[in-house]
């Protein structure tokens, strides 16, 4: 039987960079790993800042040095996190420092094309379902919107009590090509859950952003770029 593998984990360290970049001894590794998880969950599930969910957080990258922890947020609407004159980001930075007990260097960067980021597309679908939108109409709209933005392919899958049905089921729609086994392909993956009166609905999104060789010659996994393979020459 074929096994489904997370496309991000499948490419990490090969054609995609790591979300956490630091080194630690065996004694400290587990504690720092838990600390990274605390940082990510605190930002994405902030107990007081509900606007963070509307900011469109695509991913959180963490780097560590001897003196500080560098946290990079990639968001669709950075103004909701930065706030007026940077007040909100300073508050968040102080909260993170109190959480982990270390010096935090927090940076926020805007995502250039949010329509091509799988996590942002999944969260957009979740918000539409929470507003009681038709799941089929929502899937079709997101397929068209993502393909119009320049994606090579997209697949959306939902599971749960779709449309308020008594029995849970799974439905999916796709457009274009999604070569999951091709390491050279830029496959982005996102998952979230929609809270509806009937229960939770799981949402999975795969987006084919092209190939690593389309944009540049590539470098290594540290920069998230894949190296080009030399073209074969055939002689007759």
UniProtKB/Swiss-Prot annotation:
Similarity comment text for this entry: Belongs to the universal ribosomal protein uS3 family.
Gene source species: Rhodopirellula baltica (strain DSM 10527 / NCIMB 13988 / SH1)
GO cellular component: cytosolic small ribosomal subunit
Protein name as annotated: Small ribosomal subunit protein uS3
Complexes and interactors: Part of the 30S ribosomal subunit. Forms a tight complex with proteins S10 and S14.
Region (Disordered) residue spans: 212-236
Database matches in SMART domains: KH
Taxon lineage: Bacteria, Pseudomonadati, Planctomycetota, Planctomycetia, Pirellulales
Domain KH type-2: start-end pairs: 39-112
NCBIfam families according to UniProt: rpsC_bact
PROSITE patterns: KH_TYPE_2 (PS50823), RIBOSOMAL_S3 (PS00548)
A GO molecular-function descriptor: structural constituent of ribosome
Protein's job: Binds the lower part of the 30S subunit head. Binds mRNA in the 70S ribosome, positioning it for translation.
Keywords associated with the record: Ribonucleoprotein, Ribosomal protein, RNA-binding, rRNA-binding
BP GO terms, sorted: translation
Pfam families for the chain: KH_2, Ribosomal_S3_C
């Amino acid at each position: 039987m074929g096994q489904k593998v997370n496309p991000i984990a499948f490419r990490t360290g090969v054609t995609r960079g790591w979300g956490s970049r630091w080194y630690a001894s065996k004694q400290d590794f587990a504690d720092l790993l838990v600390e990274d998880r605390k940082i990510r969950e605190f930002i994405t599930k902030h107990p007081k800042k509900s606007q963070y969910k509307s900011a469109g957080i695509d991913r959180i990258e963490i780097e560590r040095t001897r003196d500080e922890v560098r946290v990079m947020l990639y968001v669709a609407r950075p103004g909701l996190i930065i706030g007026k004159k940077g007040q909100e980001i300073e508050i968040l930075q102080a909260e993170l420092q109190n959480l982990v007990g270390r010096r935090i260097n927090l940076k926020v960067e805007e995502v250039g094309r949010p329509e091509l980021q799988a996590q942002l597309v999944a969260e957009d679908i979740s918000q539409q379902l929470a507003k009681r939108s038709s799941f089929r109409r929502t899937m079709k709209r997101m397929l068209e919107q993502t393909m119009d933005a320049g994606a090579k392919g997209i697949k959306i899958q939902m599971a749960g009590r779709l449309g308020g049905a008594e029995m849970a089921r799974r439905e999916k729609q796709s457009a274009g090509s999604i070569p999951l086994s091709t390491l050279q392909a830029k496959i982005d993956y996102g998952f979230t859950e929609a809270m509806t009166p009937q229960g939770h609905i799981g949402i999975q999104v795969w987006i084919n952003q092209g190939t690593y060789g389309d944009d540049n010659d590539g470098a290594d996994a540290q920069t998230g770029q894949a190296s080009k393979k030399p073209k074969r020459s055939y002689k007759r």
